Amino acid sequence: MLYFSTNNKAPLVNFKDATINGQAPDKGLYFPKNIPVLSPGFIKNIADYSDVAIAYEIIKPYVGDKIHAGMLKKIVEETINFPIPLVPINDTISSLELYHGPTLAFKDVGARFMSRCLGFFVKNQPKKVTVLVATSGDTGGAVANGFYDVPNVEVIILYPSGKVSTVQEKQLTTLGKNIHALEVNGSFDDCQQMVKDIFARAADFTNLFLTSANSINVARWLPQQFYYFFAYKQWADKNNPPVIAVPSGNFGNICAGILAHASGLPIKHFIAACNANDVVPNFFETDIYEPKKAVATISNAMDVGNPSNFVRILEIFNQQTGDLKKLVSAKSVSDDETRATLKKVKDEYNYLLDPHGAVGYNALEKYLQQHPAQKGIVVETAHPVKFFDVVEPIIGSPVAIPQIIQDQLKLKKQSELMENNPEALRDFLMKL
């Protein structure tokens, strides 16, 4: 498989080079030259396959011959060595729980897959490989966990000061060793821009080999397709495929779902469920894509004012927004609606959503009210305990804290304060 840049001003590369480079040299995102089409027999008999076999079948054409079959199977096994259950909430809505991995967030899958691919690719790299990642919350913890103690790899995580939850901050600031947490005086978009600015000047860092672990990296983005196949495998009514609502911030997760659909996975409709950061919902209404400064919400991992992966979604549809709107809709949900939904679902169905899942549930519920013949899935992206400081006042009772989180909360934070300035990041990298 070859990959081109969405800006169309960079050479084609293979999976290995796309993974190592992160972003294309023309600042575009890598995108597969061809979208593999899965056989109808595979889809029809999906219930007969193990999750590992499904994931291997999906990712194999994207990797090509850059990782041999035995190693790729091992990477897949280590990536999804935890359950991803589809849990009914009520008669019409089920929750796809993506939070049973080591950091209790959906990003564990992409981070684990990418860290193992990159570790395989850079074993003999003479320069020190430096992974730069901006996080609005869960990416940082998942990347830190995935790359912790990987030889010859340093990980630099930028996160907006005061804009991630207590648990999220502990997960990305307490490991030490090859994991460096930089607490930036700014927003997630500022952090992401600092990373992009550094990549644009990669030639300045002669002693480092820079790459990214954000969902712009194909090795983090592509394995997110797995969830959607696992959901369909567990979906009872194969003759009536689900509507899937995806809490959306940087749009990597829903983009992977749409890519899975393009490969042949039966999905009736996708809903991009956004918070007050409504750039994409506005685009669906006006056909004008106008990035904005991110605003802070209680679903902080989606506080993104210029979603990087939206360009990939447009690429899947060959820039045909009419075709896009047939399969996908976008909905903005306020914090008040999020709180009300979270409380209602807990009170009525005894199911506890996190704030991001509540955004997804709200958008899905509204869609199903207009399409009563359909049933749907909300993609639940994180365990509610990761946002206990938001959730507990809403439901009026404590969230049960898993032992793994109790242990993390006792650890000492290790971070370095940094101004919102690419030069400050450049100076930090020069000292590595």
Which residue ranges define each predicted feature?
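PLP-dependent amino-acid enzyme catalytic core
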Residues: 1-432
